[in-house]
Amino acid sequence: MEAVRPDSCERGTAAARAEERPAPEARAHFRVTRFIMEAGVKLGMQSIPIATACTIYHKFFCEINLDAYDLYLVAMSSLYLAGKVEEQHLRTRDIINVSHRYFNPGSEPLELDSRFWELRDSIVQCELLMLRVLRFQVSFQHPHKYLLHYLISLKNWLNRYSWQRTPISVTAWALLRDSYHGGLCLRFQAQHLAVAVLYLALQVYGVEVPAEGEAEKPWWQVFSDDLTKPIIDNIVSDLIQIYTMDTEIP
């Protein structure tokens, strides 16, 4: 087991943005986190447990070499562990069956044979390994509660017509969800991520916050005092890179 700390795991890094095309590691993690999200939905997981599963996965590979373990086994164990952390417990059998159908569409559930039990044991053993590698630090502060608060405040600032005619809320939640395809959850503070996805949603629809020009400081700094425009720009840049990968990866 080789411990590493990839540059992409450092807070606010510009390493990934320096490349015109995403690194192979980023593309691999994009595919696997897409699997985590789709499997999580099929398992009936709520948004916070899915976010926790993605964060556990990303954090594990901030400590471990990419080639050391099977990525999808780590993903399945991340789902299993996240269910425990967020008290939405999952059965290993359900995780295995959903994963099997993901890779083999239309197939029947696996028989309870030696192959099944070997995979189940691998998931459990991998979970224990992940807990040790992460030093049992598997509880995270997610941006979701901040985004909810910010959306309520923004709704009160904007006029009713602007709010109703543009899907700002839906877009901001979608941007936040998609941010977990990359390691933004580890590189940036939860409050900063929440403000940045809201900022981008407003930019997408050309919506301006009332009295912005007369205010002493930008609306986004009202939500987070230590947030700066360069941080927002970095988050937006990383989000754009994620959507670029989405168009390139089948």
Swiss-Prot record:
Stored InterPro entries? Cyclin-like_dom, Cyclin-like_sf, Cyclin-Q_first_cyclin_box, Cyclin-Q_second_cyclin_box, Cyclin/Ssn8, Cyclin_N
Any one of the GO CC terms:
cyclin-dependent protein kinase holoenzyme complex
Sorted alphabetically, which keywords does the UniProt record give? Acetylation, Cyclin
Highest taxon in the source lineage: Eukaryota
Q: Which GO terms describe its molecular function?
A: cyclin-dependent protein serine/threonine kinase regulator activity; protein kinase activator activity
Q: Which GO terms describe its biological process?
A: positive regulation of MAPK cascade; regulation of cell cycle G2/M phase transition; regulation of transcription by RNA polymerase II
Q: What's the protein called, per UniProt?
A: Cyclin-Q
**What species is given as this protein's source?**
Rattus norvegicus (Rat)
Give the lineage: Eukaryota, Metazoa, Chordata, Craniata, Vertebrata
Gene name linked to the record: Ccnq
